Amino acid sequence: MHLPTLSPRRLAGAAAAACAAALIPVAALGTTASPTAPATAASPPGCPTAGLVVWMNNEQGTAGTFYSDLNFTNLSGHACTLRGHPGVSAVSLGGGQLGQPAAWPSATLRTVTLANGATATAVLAITDVGVFPPGACHQVTAAGLRVYPPNQFTSKRVPYPFGACTTGRVFMRVDPVHKL
């Protein structure tokens, strides 16, 4: 009895054909008719910095800390979303950063969908830097805040004079955004 010899090239081709033939019934099983899930609407895009007005209100003070609402109003002309903590730092009149940026406390993050004209807010806490020893803070008056909306790389400046530390201590904390 004489068996034909196959070259490695022919052997590989035959193996590929056999595998393909074996997979055809398996592929057919995967395409059995089944009800499809209803299509879900895509969520609105993230809010671009250029489409937001950033402003503050509701300042209240207790035991050495001032709390304010840091607000984000969507004026982009369409719905958009915010999720997470804004980036916040004190700035000089010339726009230079003063001291450390605001800390982000651990918190549950929620996606906030803003219709055009709607506002989301984040609570900003600023420590009265007068409570720190003079050498631990190097206090100056900030001209305002540089604010990066969550997940954005472009900032807005918010005029807001307040006492800031130029070195050392973290003196601000900002919560994640939530619906107003």
Regions found by a protein language model. Give the residues of each.
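Short, solvent-exposed loop/turn segments enriched in Ser/Thr/Gly
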Residues: A63-D69, Q139-A142
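Terminal connector regions
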Residues: V129-V170
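Asparagine-centered strand-capping/turn motif at beta-strand->loop junctions
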Residues: L70-G77
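N-terminal export and membrane-targeting signals
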Residues: H2-C19
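Intrinsically disordered, low-complexity Pro/Gly/Ser/Thr-rich segments with frequent PxxP/GP/PP motifs
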Residues: A103-G130
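Low-complexity, acidic Ser/Thr/Pro/Gly-rich terminal tails and inter-domain linkers that flank the onset
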Residues: A39-T62
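C-terminal region of N-terminal signal peptides and the immediate post-cleavage residues
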Residues: I24-G46
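Short, hydrophobic/aromatic beta-strand segments
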Residues: G77-P86
